[in-house]
From Swiss-Prot:
GO terms for molecular function: ligase activity; oxidoreductase activity. It catalyses: L-tyrosinal + AMP + diphosphate + NADP(+) = L-tyrosine + ATP + NADPH + H(+). It is an enzyme of class 1 (oxidoreductase). NCBIfam families: Thioester-redct. It holds the Pfam family PP-binding. It comes from Aspergillus flavus (strain ATCC 200026 / FGSC A1120 / IAM 13836 / NRRL 3357 / JCM 12722 / SRRC 167). Disruption phenotype: Abolishes the production of piperazines and suppresses the formation of sclerotia when lnbA is also disrupted. Keywords: Ligase, Multifunctional enzyme, Oxidoreductase, Phosphopantetheine, Phosphoprotein. The keyword Ligase applies. CDD domains: A_NRPS, SDR_e1. Belongs to the NRP synthetase family. Gene3D superfamilies: 3.30.300.30, ACP-like, N-terminal domain of ligase-like, NAD(P)-binding Rossmann-like Domain. This is Aldehyde reductase lnbA.
């Protein structure tokens, strides 16, 4: 493979000096000895009690190196270092380097057995220990660090054999990092990798006057910066004990008293400072943070209340030695709502690869250059996978490290961290980025730190559970969990709402990162002790319904709650529509009765639902709700809106071009937003977004566009985010702001809607019916503006089956199709109401256009589609099941998203097009295909036979082993339908094989 689209680092400061140093090819020992010769009496290391000079450090290291060399010591021999954090750390490493060995620093808090196993795998013979560790049961030859001796002239002037001669390829360190198994991997660090960081930390070398905090555990690779960056530059190390780090007040005092100017610490410690003492790092010249994704809220607090001169967000896995990317944080990052991990430093090369290894704007980050490790010791298979050797554009071979981190490149070359490959989880068919949940929780302003995780419940039927632990921003007044979840529900889709657990303080592991493993264990321990077991069928006969139902709730919600009150509500306790679907399936299996999703939504308390189950035993409840009178009444809710007295603004005039759009974070909305942003006549676009503030709203918009590979950094010049709610009379805005924006806007595109195929009309009504009225009210306020409303042909319901209608005209009345509507889902019912409501307004002269697309699928050129819509889920499920339900004469109108938006924008460009409805469907009937033909194409696309089954037989097979993709919708598919024939909600678009192959390829990549 040959790489292109590489991201090289900019020309660093001090490049000439670095080049000369590399050209000399001297190892770390000789480079340090240069500093000793230049300034032997300069302070090298200082702590609370004492200090040692460069000359004294040299003398001490020489004596220890001599002891090592008496036993047939060989170059790059691994030497264990088990000492307390402090001066001994520095001396021990220097001694091993002087002897030509490889340092293997161990955390002294580890058990003897763990240390022994690690060093045995490295074939170590020697360990260096201090006085406090000399009595440990470690079966190696121990060399004890004695107190250093006074410096003599002889130590510097005589021809010593130490430091031994090494070069930049010398393996100086072996740093252990956790692996996917219980055995940690030993990462080899070469001298050239350390030198790369020393001279580019991150943008220029340290100054002689700098004092660098040694705050990191020496078994952690960032400690190499603490020690070697100052020593190779003639600067000073200041020791900070762990107990100092745990008390921010004491830490700030030490920074001041020791004159510390540079410190590398973890994001978790900065987060702690933000909530306890934001000024803790204010005396620093440079503060590096890293190890975890940057917390924008915490950074904003520190920048506002007590920033260091430079705050650097640094990135670098151990395999790339300390830092390989870096970014100086500024207030602009806070405004954008995200902090970049920066650009490559020094001679680092960054490459972003898709799953096939090809260059991409978003994908896995590969790192090349001087900092890359020689590999894991004694791990040839892992090295082959993690450190590929590939051809550079110059024709030279180069080694890269595959980080496993998903990143995104901005147009200006900055790189954004998206998440871990292994932090991307799936819950009931949905792909979820845990970082997105953490970011949203932090943006509520209620929490200081958040850790989200997916936990596989050991209890039958519960599946994966989303859990988030959070520390309150104001510990004295912790927020109500229900309040936080309510905010989240306005920001995130239902399947991303976690079970929220408050915790006083985040536990940290030995590397000062959030201990996610410990949090998972904590949750599982609580759940196991409190959850009721799922009842077996025979036992339900002798238990009351409410008790059995409570057991199901506890299992499905994985809620650590031992008892449920009769008034407890399934959805208030955190139940989502996906979990509601699972609950209905469990009820049918356990109680052997038919209960519909509608019954659950109408009776969501444990007491009410238990009564419904008792009533349903021996039969089934009605699954069709006839609310025709309600729907008709709702179509008249906007009749009191005053009709506009003037013609609408021409939104494409030079002095106009200001768009107000809803639903821009949805699939169709994201593509339409992208098209509008590319139009020269469009100057600004204001998007109504469910979010707590503008920054969070902008982040949602960006994530939506990035999800479909549409985002460009220049969009920020045109894009505005207005946090709000469709269901609110003034769209969630202050009335004055509502009026201001109404006069600002030139036109309105309304795509916002609640879409859930399993929920009733009553839950769709606020956003879809009332929201549409509120959008029209906005358009009528101030100057008159056209409303372009994107509906769907689903607004007609299954009219052909019930009314015999063969075709529907664009301007035909919707009233004749009301008879079929009770047999469709709540979303379609809300579409009918909103559509009919707007038709009544159009008859009164309101400037409104209605667009009714057929079934919208992916982009016809790129194949990018929505993996979460019904059609995509059904395709994947049918492929997995190798079967599909027979639905004779089921024809659907397939239209690609790019075609739909082209039609909308073409019509909307005409001033004379308002006042009508438009069907966006294939030009002729020959271009729509039925279910059988669609599945034949699916079989061709995946090169596999897909068999037809009678509908109920297919449902039984689905119930026995439901594919993950269809689990959320299984109860809807299984409900009784009119004449047991029409399976409401199944929609199949027209396809050809080549286009379907594009869609399947995209869906597979999204799974």
């Amino acid at each position: 493979m040959m790489l292109s689209n590489l991201l090289p680092s900019p020309e660093p400061l001090g490049a000439d000096e670095y080049g000369l140093c590399v050209a000399s090819n001297l190892g770390l020992g000789q480079l340090f000895y240069r500093q000793v010769r230049q300034s032997p009496s300069s302070i090298a290391v200082v702590d609370d009690e004492s200090s040692i000079t460069y000359g004294q450090l040299h003398a001490w290291a020489v004596r220890l190196a001599a002891k090592l060399s008496q036993e047939g010591f060989v170059k790059e021999e691994a030497v264990g270092i088990v000492v307390q954090h402090g001066v001994a750390d520095v001396v021990a490493q220097m001694a091993v380097i002087y002897a030509g060995g490889s340092c293997a620093p161990m955390d002294p808090t580890m058990r003897d057995q763990q240390i022994g196993q690690r060093l045995q795998r490295l074939n170590s013979r020697f360990i260096l220990v201090d006085q406090s560790n000399r009595g440990r049961d470690l079966q190696f030859q121990q060399i004890v660090l004695e107190k250093h001796l006074p410096l003599t002239i002889t130590d510097l002037c005589e021809e010593n054999e130490f430091p031994v001669t090494t070069d930049l390829s010398h393996r100086t360190h072996l740093i252990h990092t956790s692996g996917t198994t219980s055995e940690p991997k030993a990462v080899q660090i070469a001298a050239r990798s350390i030198l790369q960081v020393v001279f580019h930390a991150p943008f220029e070398p340290l100054a002689v006057e700098d004092v660098v905090a040694h705050a990191n555990n020496s078994s952690f690779d960032v400690s190499l910066f603490d020690i070697w960056a100052p020593l190779l530059r003639g600067a000073r190390i200041a020791i900070l004990k762990k107990m100092v780090l745990l008390d921010l007040v004491v830490l700030a005092e030490h920074i001041d008293r020791l004159g510390i100017t540079v410190m590398a610490t973890t994001t978790a410690l900065l987060n702690l400072a933000a909530s306890t003492l934001p000024t803790a790092f204010s005396k620093l010249r440079i503060c590096f943070i890293g190890g975890e994704a940057a917390n924008v809220s915490a950074i904003e607090t520190v920048l506002r209340k007590g920033p260091p001169k430079m705050l650097i967000n640094a990135y670098g896995p151990t395999e790339c030695c300390i830092f390989c990317l870096a970014h100086r944080v500024t207030p602009k990052d806070i405004q954008m709502g995200s902090v970049s991990i920066g650009m490559p430093i020094g001679h680092t090369i960054a490459y972003i690869a898709d799953e096939s290894g090809c260059a991409a704007n978003e994908g896995e980050l590969w790192i090349g250059g001087a900092g890359v490790s020689p590999g894991y010791i004694n791990e040839p298979e892992k090295n082959a996978k993690s450190f590929p050797t590939i051809m550079m554009p110059s024709g030279e071979a180069a080694r890269f490290y595959r980080t496993g981190d998903i990143v995104r490149r901005r147009d200006d070359g900055q790189i954004d961290y998206v998440g871990r490959v292994d932090h991307q989880i799936k819950v009931r068919g949905f792909r979820i980025e845990l970082e997105a949940i953490e970011t949203s929780l932090l943006q509520t302003g209620l929490f200081a730190e958040v850790a989200a995780m997916g936990i596989q419940s050991p209890h039958q039927g519960a599946g994966s559970v989303l859990v988030a632990y959070a520390t309150p921003k104001d510990p004295a007044h912790p927020p109500e969990i229900s309040k936080a979840l309510k905010i989240l529900q306005d920001i995130l889709p239902e399947y991303m709402i976690p079970q929220l657990q408050l915790i006083e303080k985040m536990p940290l592991n030995s590397h000062a990162k959030v201990d996610r493993k410990g949090l998972k264990q904590l949750f599982c321990q609580r759940s196991t002790s409190l959850l009721k077991p799922v009842p077996k069928l025979p036992n339900t006969l002798c238990q009351d319904t409410q008790t059995v139902l409570a057991s199901l709730w506890a299992t499905i919600l994985a809620t650590p709650k031992s008892e449920y009150k009769e008034s407890d509500d399934f959805f208030v306790l955190g139940g989502t529509s996906l979990q509601a679907s699972l609950l209905i399936s469990q009820i049918r299996q356990v109680f052997r009765c038919e209960v519909s999703l509608l019954a659950l939504y109408d009776n969501s308390t444990v007491g009410a639902l238990a009564s419904i189950i008792d009533h349903a035993k021996g039969g089934h409840l009605k699954t069709v709700r006839d609310e025709r009178e309600v729907w008709l009444a709702d179509t008249k809710l906007a009749d009191d809106l005053p009709a506009p007295m003037t013609t609408p603004v021409n939104w494409q005039r030079d002095i106009e071009g200001r768009i107000f759009i809803t639903g821009a974070t949805g699939f169709v909305g994201a593509f339409l937003l992208s098209d509008l942003l590319h139009m020269p006549s469009v100057h600004q676009i204001g998007c109504l977004v469910r979010a707590p503030n503008s920054a969070a709203g902008m982040q949602r918009l960006r994530l939506a566009l990035e999800k479909y590979n549409l985002w460009k950094d220049e969009f920020t010049n045109k894009l505005l985010a207005f946090p709000g709610l469709l269901e609110d009379k003034y769209l969630g805005l202050e009335q004055a702001r509502f009026n201001e924006l109404a006069n600002w806007a030139s036109v309105v595109f309304h795509l916002g809607a609640r879409v859930n195929y399993t929920q009733p009309y009553s839950l769709h009504r606020p956003a879809n019916t009332l929201g549409t009225i509120n959008v029209v009210r906005f358009a009528c306020t101030g100057r008159s503006k056209a409303v372009h409303y994107v509906s769907s042909i689903s607004c007609f319901g299954p009219t052909g089956f019930f009314t015999g209608t063969a075709s529907v005209g664009e301007d035909d009345s919707l009233l004749p199709h009301l008879e079929a509507l009770p047999y469709d889902h709540g979303y379609a019912q809300s579409q009918w109401v909103a559509d009919q409501l707007l038709r009544r307004l159009m008859d009164r002269g309101f400037p409104i256009s209605i667009y009714r697309p057929g079934f919208i699928t992916g982009h016809s050129q790129t194949g990018v589609c929505n993996p979460d819509d019904f059609f995509s889920r059904l395709m994947i499920a049918c492929e997995q099941m190798k079967s599909y339900p027979m639905l004779p004469n089921q024809r659907k109108e397939f239209v690609p998203v790019d075609y739909v938006n082209s039609v909308i924008l073409h019509i909307a460009a005409s001033e004379h097009a308002v006042g009508r409805a438009y069907h966006i469907v294939p030009p002729n009937r020959d271009m729509s295909i039925d279910m059988d033909a669609t599945m034949d194409l699916l079989g061709d696309a995946v090169n596999s036979r897909i068999h037809a089954l009678p509908y109920m037989e297919w449902i039984d097979r689905l119930a026995a082993n439901p594919p993950v993709a269809l689990q959320p919708l299984q109860p809807m598919l299984a409900e009784k339908v009119h004449d047991a024939n029409y399976p409401g909600g199944l929609k199949f678009p027209t396809l050809d094989c080549s286009l379907l192959k594009k869609y399947i390829a995209h869906l597979r990549s999204a799974c």
